[in-house]
UniProtKB/Swiss-Prot annotation:
Catalyzes the reversible isomerization of glucose-6-phosphate to fructose-6-phosphate. PROSITE patterns: P_GLUCOSE_ISOMERASE_2, P_GLUCOSE_ISOMERASE_3. It is found in: Cytoplasm. Belongs to the GPI family. The active site is at E351 (proton donor), H382, K509. Its main location: cytoplasm. GO terms for molecular function: carbohydrate derivative binding; glucose-6-phosphate isomerase activity; monosaccharide binding. The keyword Cell division does not apply. InterPro entries: G6P_Isomerase (IPR001672), G6P_Isomerase_C (IPR023096), Phosphoglucose_isomerase_CS (IPR018189), SIS_dom_sf (IPR046348), SIS_PGI_1 (IPR035476), SIS_PGI_2 (IPR035482). It comes from Coxiella burnetii (strain RSA 493 / Nine Mile phase I). GO terms for biological process: gluconeogenesis; glucose 6-phosphate metabolic process; glycolytic process. The keyword Isomerase applies. This is Glucose-6-phosphate isomerase.
């Protein structure tokens, strides 16, 4: 029986018909304790999902659908290393990287031992650099760490580093290079000193074009200063699942950190791919980061579905995507330090859930995934919240609020007020009675107020979740990221798709090689479609290679 034929799914269709014409204002008016009942706290996070177009029966039916998809079994498979891809290879075992409390796995003991060894290696290097004992080619201490990677090899560490900057030990600084455009590299290193700069090259396969090209640029940049190749070897580290390729590139074996094949790039910040972060904030704080994620892992494994934060977050997304036909979801963090979180979550969701084939190879017959995007509040209020408030689409929003930036900082009350104000307005709207009252109180005549009111009405009934961190620290950040990882995994289980591959992006990479040869005037262009051929010819014409 397919997903859409299951009894819970059919019941959800009827429930959608029942609720689609109701307004959330009425839910709150009829239930004064709705905000209390539809909220929970776990792993250092507070989650309010009361401003959603659901009642308790909806939640029950969504949970039944999850059970019908064998979610309990699939959760345990995630934590036991029993998930495999179409080739039978283990995937999705990233949760093992943060099992900090008495590793209790009954299988994969070798993986656990390797993780422990990796922890020790990361810890030792972190201490050496932070204490100034790791030297460059002129015997000066390292001050700048440049992470070269792309996708998950860059987005995760960069996002987490920016979020945890108050924990970075001066004078250490981290920088991140990912783009093939050489501007990214040269603008990043322009103010750096080669004598005190360490490059960390992160690539699972160590064949990633963008990463290797930037690594080559790093080599040239260092050689201009050091003159001798043997002098710059201490300025390179590699994180990879292909250590032999890293060694061939010129990385010393002792400077190569393991990235296992069963760790996907977008789930790799917990591994040595987070080396730059571990060095910057120190091993103790990095371990707190792992502990926070582990706390969310434990909650995810143990809590009942209707009290389970990642599961509820996923089921609500399923509700809007598959029944309200939402095509997009927004993430709005109200903290400057979380500026890169929307980009990170965009990749996590869209690369994991952008699939049209089920696990058995058959076609998907229901919508999967959505366009996930966002920006910082309050900046976003002055750019695109207008679409949320008075547009015509259903766009679920996750608001993420931080009460305090750190133990020493002041409460972020103005930010919190704006965040809560947006969620309340999305839910209740601004009806004609309220608009007219406010306009008349401003001294506007009734007839003119009637005309103006039409343009100021806000229908409301737009869904949102609010996630609150008491303080943004390594523990709470780890918990927050694990929350969304598990949310995405639950969605993949219900849709019966593989969240741990991304084959779609490979074809474009292959074609780029052929097109590059054509742009270098080395190959026949007859294999390209007429549009691509015309574009190639236009580029060549501008370059002066064609009349």
């Amino acid at each position: 029986m397919s997903l859409v034929e299951s009894p819970p799914w059919q019941a959800l269709k009827s429930k959608y018909q029942e609720l689609s014409s109701l307004h959330m204002r009425d839910f709150f008016a009829q239930d004064k304790k709705r905000g209390t009942r539809l909220s929970l706290e776990a792993a250092g996070l507070y989650f309010d999902y009361s401003k959603n177009r659901v009642d308790e029966k909806t939640i029950d039916l969504l949970c039944e659908s999850a059970n019908a998809c064998n979610l309990p079994l699939r959760i345990e498979q995630l934590f036991s290393g029993k998930l495999t891809n179409e080739s039978g290879e283990m995937v999705g075992f990233h949760t093992a990287l943060r099992q900090v409390n008495n590793f209790s796995f009954k299988t994969n003991n070798n993986a656990i031992q390797e993780i422990h060894a990796s922890w020790e290696k990361i810890k030792k290097l972190s201490i050496r650099i932070r204490e100034g004992d790791y030297k460059g080619f002129t015997n000066k201490s390292i001050t700048d760490i440049v992470n070269i990677g792309i996708g998950g090899s860059s987005l995760g560490p960069q996002m987490a580093y920016n979020a945890l900057k108050p924990y970075v030990k001066a004078p250490l600084r981290c920088h991140f290079i990912s783009n093939l455009d050489d501007t990214d590299f040269y603008e990043t290193v322009r103010t750096l000193n080669p004598e005190t700069t360490l490059f960390i090259i992160t690539s699972k396969t160590f064949t990633t074009k963008e990463t290797l090209e930037n690594a080559r640029r790093a080599t040239e940049w260092l050689m201009q200063a050091a003159k001798k190749e043997n002098l710059i070897q201490t300025h390179f580290m590699a994180v990879t699942a292909a250590p032999e390729k890293a060694h061939e590139f010129g990385i010393q074996k002792d400077n190569i950190f393991m990235l296992w094949p069963w760790v996907g790039g977008r789930f790799s910040v917990w591994s040595a791919a987070g080396l730059s972060l571990a060095i910057a904030i120190g091993w103790e704080e990095f371990f707190e980061f792992l502990r926070g994620a582990h706390a969310m892992d434990t909650h995810f494994r143990q809590a009942e579905f209707n009290k389970n934060m990642p599961i509820l977050l996923a089921l609500l997304s399923i509700w809007y995507i598959n029944f309200f036909h939402a095509k997009t979801q927004a993430i709005i963090p109200y903290s400057q330090r979380l500026v890169y979180l929307p980009d990170y979550l965009t990749q996590l969701h869209m690369e994991s859930l952008g699939k049209s084939v089920q696990l058995d190879g058959s076609a998907v017959h229901w919508q999967t995934g959505a366009v996930v995007w966002g920006d910082l509040g309050t900046n976003s209020q002055h750019s695109f919240h207008q679409l949320f408030l008075q547009g015509t689409m259903v766009i679920p929003v996750d608001f993420i609020a931080v009460l305090k930036n750190s133990r020493e900082s002041h409460w972020q009350l103005p930010l919190i007020a704006n965040c809560l104000g947006q969620s309340q307005t999305l839910m209740e709207g601004y009806d004609k009675e309220g608009v007219m009252r406010d306009l008349i109180n401003q001294g506007i005549e009734h007839e003119k107020a009637e005309k103006l009111a039409t343009y100021r009405l806000i229908r409301g009934n737009n869904p949102s979740n609010t996630i609150i961190l008491e303080e943004l620290n390594p523990y709470s950040l780890g918990s927050l990221l694990a929350l969304y990882e598990h949310k995405v995994y639950v969605q993949s289980v219900i849709w019966n798709i593989n969240p741990f591959d991304q084959w779609g992006v490979e074809r474009g990479k292959h074609l780029a090689k052929d097109i590059l040869q054509a742009l270098q005037a080395e190959t026949d262009q007859s294999s390209f479609d007429s549009s691509t051929e015309r574009l190639i010819n236009y580029v060549l014409k501008i370059k002066g290679n064609r009349p």
